[in-house]
Amino acid sequence: MIQVRKSFTLDQFEDHLSSLAEGESRLSLPNLIKAEAVGATASLMQLIATWGRNPDAQLKLYAPELGSVSAANFASSPVGLAALNAARSVVSQNGESVSRRAAMMLAERYVREMHDGRLEDIKAANSITLLSMDNAHHLGRPVRLYSGAGETVRSARDLADFLRNCFTVLMTSETRLPAALDLAEPASGILFEAFQNTHEHARTNWKKDELPRSTRGVTVGWRYVERARLVDAAGHHRVFRKYFEAVAEDEGQGRNAQFIELSVFDGGPGLAQSWFRAREPRNIRHGDVTLEEELTAVYACLQKGGTTKGNNSAGNGLYRILRLTSERGGFVRLRTGRLSLARSFAESTLFKPADVEMEDAVTGSTAAQRHAWADGTVLTIMLPVRRGARQ
Protein backbone atom coordinates (compact mmCIF):
# COMPACT_ATOMS: atom_id res chain seq x y z
CA MET A 1 0.00 0.00 0.00
CA ILE A 2 1.16 3.53 -0.80
CA GLN A 3 1.05 5.54 2.41
CA VAL A 4 1.38 9.26 1.87
CA ARG A 5 2.91 11.14 4.79
CA LYS A 6 1.65 14.41 6.20
CA SER A 7 4.90 16.14 5.21
CA PHE A 8 4.70 15.12 1.55
CA THR A 9 7.81 15.83 -0.56
CA LEU A 10 8.61 15.68 -4.27
CA ASP A 11 11.14 12.92 -3.62
CA GLN A 12 8.35 10.83 -2.05
CA PHE A 13 6.13 11.69 -5.02
CA GLU A 14 8.60 10.06 -7.41
CA ASP A 15 8.89 7.01 -5.12
CA HIS A 16 5.10 6.61 -5.04
CA LEU A 17 4.87 6.85 -8.82
CA SER A 18 7.42 4.04 -9.05
CA SER A 19 5.19 1.93 -6.78
CA LEU A 20 2.22 2.59 -9.05
CA ALA A 21 4.29 1.55 -12.06
CA GLU A 22 4.98 -1.74 -10.28
CA GLY A 23 1.23 -2.39 -9.96
CA GLU A 24 0.36 -1.10 -6.48
CA SER A 25 -3.34 -0.16 -6.39
CA ARG A 26 -3.97 0.71 -2.73
CA LEU A 27 -3.56 4.28 -1.50
CA SER A 28 -3.79 5.73 1.99
CA LEU A 29 -3.90 9.49 2.53
CA PRO A 30 -3.76 11.32 5.87
CA ASN A 31 -6.60 13.64 6.84
CA LEU A 32 -4.20 16.58 7.06
CA ILE A 33 -1.38 17.10 4.58
CA LYS A 34 1.16 19.88 5.08
CA ALA A 35 2.53 19.68 1.51
CA GLU A 36 5.12 22.38 2.13
CA ALA A 37 7.29 21.40 -0.85
CA VAL A 38 7.04 23.52 -3.97
CA GLY A 39 4.13 22.28 -6.07
CA ALA A 40 3.43 19.46 -3.61
CA THR A 41 -0.36 19.81 -3.62
CA ALA A 42 -0.48 19.71 -7.42
CA SER A 43 1.90 16.74 -7.43
CA LEU A 44 -0.43 14.90 -5.07
CA MET A 45 -3.24 15.56 -7.53
CA GLN A 46 -1.14 14.02 -10.30
CA LEU A 47 -0.32 11.03 -8.11
CA ILE A 48 -4.03 10.56 -7.46
CA ALA A 49 -4.90 10.84 -11.16
CA THR A 50 -2.26 8.24 -12.06
CA TRP A 51 -3.41 5.88 -9.29
CA GLY A 52 -7.05 6.32 -10.31
CA ARG A 53 -6.36 4.85 -13.77
CA ASN A 54 -5.90 1.44 -12.14
CA PRO A 55 -9.24 -0.42 -12.25
CA ASP A 56 -8.49 -1.77 -8.76
CA ALA A 57 -7.66 1.63 -7.23
CA GLN A 58 -8.65 1.37 -3.56
CA LEU A 59 -8.61 4.30 -1.14
CA LYS A 60 -8.18 3.73 2.59
CA LEU A 61 -9.50 6.42 4.91
CA TYR A 62 -8.05 7.34 8.28
CA ALA A 63 -11.57 7.29 9.67
CA PRO A 64 -13.55 4.55 11.48
CA GLU A 65 -16.81 5.42 9.68
CA LEU A 66 -18.37 8.03 7.41
CA GLY A 67 -20.15 9.66 10.31
CA SER A 68 -16.87 10.62 11.96
CA VAL A 69 -15.38 14.11 11.98
CA SER A 70 -12.19 12.79 10.40
CA ALA A 71 -14.10 11.48 7.36
CA ALA A 72 -15.84 14.83 6.86
CA ASN A 73 -12.56 16.71 7.20
CA PHE A 74 -10.91 14.45 4.65
CA ALA A 75 -13.71 14.86 2.10
CA SER A 76 -13.68 18.63 2.64
CA SER A 77 -10.15 19.07 1.36
CA PRO A 78 -8.86 19.31 -2.22
CA VAL A 79 -6.71 16.20 -1.93
CA GLY A 80 -9.46 14.19 -0.22
CA LEU A 81 -12.13 15.20 -2.72
CA ALA A 82 -9.88 14.40 -5.70
CA ALA A 83 -9.01 11.00 -4.22
CA LEU A 84 -12.66 10.11 -3.63
CA ASN A 85 -13.50 11.14 -7.18
CA ALA A 86 -10.73 8.93 -8.61
CA ALA A 87 -11.15 5.87 -6.36
CA ARG A 88 -12.80 2.68 -7.62
CA SER A 89 -13.46 1.53 -4.06
CA VAL A 90 -13.14 3.02 -0.56
CA VAL A 91 -12.54 1.32 2.79
CA SER A 92 -12.52 2.66 6.33
CA GLN A 93 -9.64 2.57 8.77
CA ASN A 94 -10.93 -0.83 9.88
CA GLY A 95 -11.00 -2.19 6.32
CA GLU A 96 -14.78 -2.08 5.97
CA SER A 97 -16.27 -1.09 2.62
CA VAL A 98 -17.50 2.51 2.41
CA SER A 99 -19.87 4.06 -0.13
CA ARG A 100 -17.81 6.30 -2.39
CA ARG A 101 -20.89 8.31 -3.34
CA ALA A 102 -21.85 8.85 0.30
CA ALA A 103 -18.30 9.90 1.12
CA MET A 104 -18.32 12.50 -1.65
CA MET A 105 -21.61 13.91 -0.37
CA LEU A 106 -19.74 14.94 2.77
CA ALA A 107 -17.88 17.49 0.64
CA GLU A 108 -20.96 19.38 -0.62
CA ARG A 109 -20.48 22.38 1.67
CA TYR A 110 -16.78 22.55 0.82
CA VAL A 111 -17.54 22.43 -2.91
CA ARG A 112 -20.00 25.32 -2.57
CA GLU A 113 -17.39 27.35 -0.68
CA MET A 114 -14.89 26.59 -3.42
CA HIS A 115 -17.31 28.02 -5.98
CA ASP A 116 -18.39 31.29 -4.43
CA GLY A 117 -17.73 31.21 -0.69
CA ARG A 118 -15.08 33.06 1.28
CA LEU A 119 -11.52 32.25 0.27
CA GLU A 120 -10.63 32.18 3.96
CA ASP A 121 -12.84 29.10 4.33
CA ILE A 122 -10.94 27.06 1.73
CA LYS A 123 -7.47 28.28 2.62
CA ALA A 124 -5.19 25.42 3.68
CA ALA A 125 -1.99 26.53 5.39
CA ASN A 126 -0.25 28.65 2.75
CA SER A 127 -2.34 27.84 -0.33
CA ILE A 128 -5.77 27.97 -1.95
CA THR A 129 -6.82 25.21 -4.37
CA LEU A 130 -9.76 25.15 -6.77
CA LEU A 131 -10.89 21.89 -8.37
CA SER A 132 -12.75 21.51 -11.65
CA MET A 133 -14.42 18.09 -11.71
CA ASP A 134 -15.63 17.53 -15.26
CA ASN A 135 -17.61 14.39 -14.40
CA ALA A 136 -19.64 16.07 -11.64
CA HIS A 137 -23.35 16.51 -12.36
CA HIS A 138 -23.57 19.62 -10.18
CA LEU A 139 -21.09 22.36 -9.27
CA GLY A 140 -18.35 20.71 -11.30
CA ARG A 141 -16.63 23.84 -12.56
CA PRO A 142 -15.98 26.68 -10.08
CA VAL A 143 -17.35 30.07 -11.10
CA ARG A 144 -14.03 31.53 -10.03
CA LEU A 145 -12.44 29.73 -12.99
CA TYR A 146 -15.36 29.58 -15.44
CA SER A 147 -17.94 32.06 -16.68
CA GLY A 148 -21.39 31.56 -18.17
CA ALA A 149 -22.57 27.97 -18.09
CA GLY A 150 -19.11 26.69 -17.23
CA GLU A 151 -17.91 26.33 -20.81
CA THR A 152 -15.60 29.36 -20.98
CA VAL A 153 -12.47 29.90 -18.91
CA ARG A 154 -12.52 33.29 -17.25
CA SER A 155 -10.45 36.07 -18.76
CA ALA A 156 -7.00 37.01 -17.51
CA ARG A 157 -8.56 40.20 -16.10
CA ASP A 158 -11.02 38.18 -14.01
CA LEU A 159 -8.26 35.85 -12.87
CA ALA A 160 -6.12 38.84 -11.84
CA ASP A 161 -8.87 39.89 -9.42
CA PHE A 162 -9.03 36.32 -8.11
CA LEU A 163 -5.25 36.28 -7.55
CA ARG A 164 -5.26 39.62 -5.73
CA ASN A 165 -7.90 38.27 -3.39
CA CYS A 166 -5.86 35.08 -2.86
CA PHE A 167 -2.68 37.02 -2.09
CA THR A 168 -4.53 39.23 0.38
CA VAL A 169 -5.92 36.19 2.20
CA LEU A 170 -2.69 34.18 2.19
CA MET A 171 -0.31 36.91 3.33
CA THR A 172 -0.28 38.46 6.78
CA SER A 173 -0.42 42.22 7.15
CA GLU A 174 3.07 42.16 8.69
CA THR A 175 4.70 40.39 5.74
CA ARG A 176 2.65 41.60 2.78
CA LEU A 177 4.69 43.58 0.26
CA PRO A 178 3.12 45.95 -2.30
CA ALA A 179 5.06 44.13 -5.02
CA ALA A 180 3.09 40.94 -4.26
CA LEU A 181 -0.22 42.46 -5.35
CA ASP A 182 1.53 43.93 -8.38
CA LEU A 183 2.33 40.37 -9.46
CA ALA A 184 -1.36 39.55 -9.86
CA GLU A 185 -1.60 40.94 -13.38
CA PRO A 186 1.38 39.13 -14.97
CA ALA A 187 0.57 35.99 -12.96
CA SER A 188 -3.00 36.04 -14.27
CA GLY A 189 -1.65 35.68 -17.80
CA ILE A 190 0.25 32.57 -16.74
CA LEU A 191 -2.79 31.15 -14.96
CA PHE A 192 -5.09 31.80 -17.91
CA GLU A 193 -2.79 30.22 -20.49
CA ALA A 194 -2.08 27.14 -18.37
CA PHE A 195 -5.66 26.46 -17.27
CA GLN A 196 -7.05 27.17 -20.74
CA ASN A 197 -4.65 24.50 -21.99
CA THR A 198 -6.19 21.93 -19.61
CA HIS A 199 -9.68 22.91 -20.78
CA GLU A 200 -8.76 22.37 -24.42
CA HIS A 201 -6.57 19.26 -24.16
CA ALA A 202 -6.91 17.47 -20.80
CA ARG A 203 -10.55 16.38 -20.59
CA THR A 204 -10.08 13.41 -22.92
CA ASN A 205 -7.73 10.44 -23.20
CA TRP A 206 -5.20 9.71 -25.92
CA LYS A 207 -8.02 8.46 -28.19
CA LYS A 208 -9.92 11.73 -27.62
CA ASP A 209 -12.60 9.89 -25.63
CA GLU A 210 -14.02 11.84 -22.71
CA LEU A 211 -12.43 10.85 -19.41
CA PRO A 212 -15.00 9.16 -17.13
CA ARG A 213 -13.47 10.91 -14.11
CA SER A 214 -11.52 14.09 -14.64
CA THR A 215 -10.12 16.45 -12.01
CA ARG A 216 -8.30 19.58 -13.10
CA GLY A 217 -7.45 22.62 -11.07
CA VAL A 218 -5.18 25.36 -9.81
CA THR A 219 -3.27 26.01 -6.61
CA VAL A 220 -2.25 29.51 -5.57
CA GLY A 221 0.38 29.52 -2.86
CA TRP A 222 2.56 31.91 -0.93
CA ARG A 223 5.97 31.01 0.44
CA TYR A 224 7.74 32.93 3.20
CA VAL A 225 10.99 31.12 3.93
CA GLU A 226 14.25 31.95 5.69
CA ARG A 227 16.97 32.20 3.06
CA ALA A 228 19.17 29.89 5.12
CA ARG A 229 16.53 27.12 4.80
CA LEU A 230 15.82 27.49 1.09
CA VAL A 231 18.36 25.03 -0.28
CA ASP A 232 17.35 22.23 2.11
CA ALA A 233 13.75 22.58 0.90
CA ALA A 234 14.85 21.47 -2.59
CA GLY A 235 15.49 17.87 -1.56
CA HIS A 236 17.25 15.87 -4.27
CA HIS A 237 15.91 18.03 -7.10
CA ARG A 238 19.11 19.61 -8.40
CA VAL A 239 17.52 22.39 -10.48
CA PHE A 240 15.52 23.54 -7.45
CA ARG A 241 18.72 23.64 -5.43
CA LYS A 242 20.50 25.75 -8.03
CA TYR A 243 17.66 28.26 -8.10
CA PHE A 244 17.35 28.49 -4.33
CA GLU A 245 21.11 28.88 -3.92
CA ALA A 246 20.98 31.97 -6.12
CA VAL A 247 17.99 33.36 -4.22
CA ALA A 248 19.60 32.62 -0.83
CA GLU A 249 22.63 34.73 -1.75
CA ASP A 250 20.47 37.80 -2.37
CA GLU A 251 20.64 39.00 1.24
CA GLY A 252 19.84 42.54 0.17
CA GLN A 253 16.23 41.38 -0.09
CA GLY A 254 16.06 40.63 3.63
CA ARG A 255 16.36 37.60 5.88
CA ASN A 256 13.29 35.90 4.43
CA ALA A 257 12.47 35.16 0.81
CA GLN A 258 8.92 35.45 -0.49
CA PHE A 259 7.47 33.65 -3.49
CA ILE A 260 4.16 33.39 -5.26
CA GLU A 261 3.39 29.84 -6.39
CA LEU A 262 1.02 28.99 -9.22
CA SER A 263 0.34 25.35 -10.03
CA VAL A 264 -2.03 24.04 -12.69
CA PHE A 265 -2.76 20.30 -12.84
CA ASP A 266 -4.83 17.83 -14.82
CA GLY A 267 -5.24 14.10 -15.37
CA GLY A 268 -5.34 14.17 -19.16
CA PRO A 269 -3.06 12.46 -21.69
CA GLY A 270 -0.09 14.74 -21.01
CA LEU A 271 1.67 17.26 -23.24
CA ALA A 272 3.56 14.84 -25.48
CA GLN A 273 0.63 12.44 -25.91
CA SER A 274 -1.63 15.37 -26.85
CA TRP A 275 0.95 16.36 -29.43
CA PHE A 276 1.10 12.89 -30.96
CA ARG A 277 -2.65 12.24 -30.95
CA ALA A 278 -3.16 15.36 -33.09
CA ARG A 279 -0.74 14.00 -35.69
CA GLU A 280 -0.48 10.22 -35.58
CA PRO A 281 -2.00 7.46 -33.39
CA ARG A 282 1.10 6.62 -31.35
CA ASN A 283 0.67 5.69 -27.69
CA ILE A 284 3.54 6.46 -25.32
CA ARG A 285 2.36 3.94 -22.73
CA HIS A 286 2.31 1.19 -25.38
CA GLY A 287 5.96 1.79 -26.25
CA ASP A 288 5.28 3.50 -29.58
CA VAL A 289 7.34 6.58 -28.64
CA THR A 290 10.97 6.78 -27.52
CA LEU A 291 11.94 8.96 -24.56
CA GLU A 292 13.80 11.32 -26.88
CA GLU A 293 10.72 11.66 -29.08
CA GLU A 294 8.60 12.40 -26.02
CA LEU A 295 10.99 15.17 -24.95
CA THR A 296 11.02 16.62 -28.47
CA ALA A 297 7.21 16.66 -28.49
CA VAL A 298 7.11 18.52 -25.16
CA TYR A 299 9.55 21.10 -26.51
CA ALA A 300 7.35 21.47 -29.58
CA CYS A 301 4.43 22.31 -27.28
CA LEU A 302 6.54 24.95 -25.53
CA GLN A 303 7.75 26.66 -28.68
CA LYS A 304 6.13 29.79 -30.03
CA GLY A 305 3.45 28.68 -32.47
CA GLY A 306 3.50 25.10 -31.20
CA THR A 307 -0.07 23.83 -31.32
CA THR A 308 -2.20 20.71 -31.58
CA LYS A 309 -4.98 22.70 -33.25
CA GLY A 310 -5.40 23.74 -36.86
CA ASN A 311 -5.57 27.45 -36.04
CA ASN A 312 -2.20 29.00 -36.85
CA SER A 313 -2.76 31.79 -34.33
CA ALA A 314 -3.01 29.23 -31.53
CA GLY A 315 -0.21 27.50 -29.69
CA ASN A 316 1.57 30.42 -28.03
CA GLY A 317 0.19 29.84 -24.53
CA LEU A 318 2.92 27.65 -23.04
CA TYR A 319 5.59 29.74 -24.72
CA ARG A 320 4.13 32.88 -23.12
CA ILE A 321 4.25 31.18 -19.73
CA LEU A 322 8.00 30.61 -20.09
CA ARG A 323 8.53 34.14 -21.33
CA LEU A 324 6.63 35.75 -18.45
CA THR A 325 8.43 33.57 -15.91
CA SER A 326 11.83 34.49 -17.34
CA GLU A 327 10.96 38.19 -17.24
CA ARG A 328 10.14 37.90 -13.53
CA GLY A 329 13.20 35.86 -12.56
CA GLY A 330 11.04 32.86 -11.66
CA PHE A 331 11.16 29.10 -11.79
CA VAL A 332 9.22 26.53 -13.84
CA ARG A 333 8.62 22.85 -13.10
CA LEU A 334 6.85 20.55 -15.55
CA ARG A 335 5.91 16.93 -14.77
CA THR A 336 4.26 15.01 -17.57
CA GLY A 337 4.44 11.42 -18.79
CA ARG A 338 7.93 10.03 -18.23
CA LEU A 339 9.53 13.46 -17.94
CA SER A 340 10.29 15.68 -14.96
CA LEU A 341 11.58 19.00 -16.27
CA ALA A 342 12.51 22.35 -14.76
CA ARG A 343 13.94 25.69 -15.77
CA SER A 344 15.52 28.28 -13.49
CA PHE A 345 15.48 31.99 -14.26
CA ALA A 346 17.27 33.26 -11.16
CA GLU A 347 17.92 36.50 -13.01
CA SER A 348 15.33 38.29 -15.11
CA THR A 349 16.17 37.65 -18.73
CA LEU A 350 14.98 38.33 -22.26
CA PHE A 351 13.38 35.12 -23.47
CA LYS A 352 13.90 34.11 -27.09
CA PRO A 353 11.39 32.06 -29.15
CA ALA A 354 13.77 29.12 -29.60
CA ASP A 355 14.96 29.15 -25.98
CA VAL A 356 12.65 26.46 -24.59
CA GLU A 357 15.19 23.86 -23.48
CA MET A 358 14.70 22.64 -19.92
CA GLU A 359 16.67 20.43 -17.55
CA ASP A 360 15.80 17.20 -15.81
CA ALA A 361 14.45 18.41 -12.46
CA VAL A 362 16.37 15.80 -10.46
CA THR A 363 19.72 15.43 -12.25
CA GLY A 364 20.01 18.78 -13.98
CA SER A 365 20.81 17.05 -17.28
CA THR A 366 19.53 18.47 -20.56
CA ALA A 367 19.33 14.96 -22.03
CA ALA A 368 16.09 13.00 -21.69
CA GLN A 369 15.91 11.18 -18.34
CA ARG A 370 13.30 8.48 -17.72
CA HIS A 371 11.05 8.73 -14.66
CA ALA A 372 8.08 6.65 -13.57
CA TRP A 373 4.96 7.34 -15.60
CA ALA A 374 2.65 10.15 -14.43
CA ASP A 375 -0.74 10.80 -15.99
CA GLY A 376 -1.63 14.32 -16.99
CA THR A 377 0.50 17.40 -16.52
CA VAL A 378 1.57 19.53 -13.58
CA LEU A 379 2.95 22.98 -14.29
CA THR A 380 4.34 24.87 -11.29
CA ILE A 381 5.58 28.45 -11.48
CA MET A 382 7.38 30.29 -8.69
CA LEU A 383 7.73 34.06 -8.90
CA PRO A 384 9.89 35.93 -6.37
CA VAL A 385 8.41 38.88 -4.50
CA ARG A 386 11.15 41.49 -4.19
CA ARG A 387 11.32 44.27 -1.64
CA GLY A 388 11.24 47.77 -3.03
CA ALA A 389 10.39 46.49 -6.50
CA ARG A 390 7.39 47.43 -8.58
CA GLN A 391 6.78 44.30 -10.55
Regions found by a protein language model. Name each.
Residues 1-29, 49-56, 60, 78-136, ...:
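Flexible, glycine-/charge-rich segments associated with ATP-binding catalytic modules
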Residues 2, 33-39, 168-192:
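Conserved short strand/loop->alpha-helix "switch" segment adjacent to the catalytic nucleotide/phosphoryl-transfer site
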Residues 32-34, 40-52:
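Eukaryotic low-complexity, non-globular regulatory regions
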Residues 56-72:
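A short amphipathic beta-strand at an alpha->beta junction
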Residues 131-151:
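N-terminal targeting/assembly segments of extracytoplasmic apparatus and virion spike/baseplate proteins
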Residues 155-168:
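N-terminal pre-Walker A segment at the start of P-loop NTPase domains
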Residues 179-256, 319-325:
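Conserved ATP-binding N-box helix of the HATPase_c
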Residues 266:
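Acidic ATP/Mg2+-coordinating residue in the GHKL
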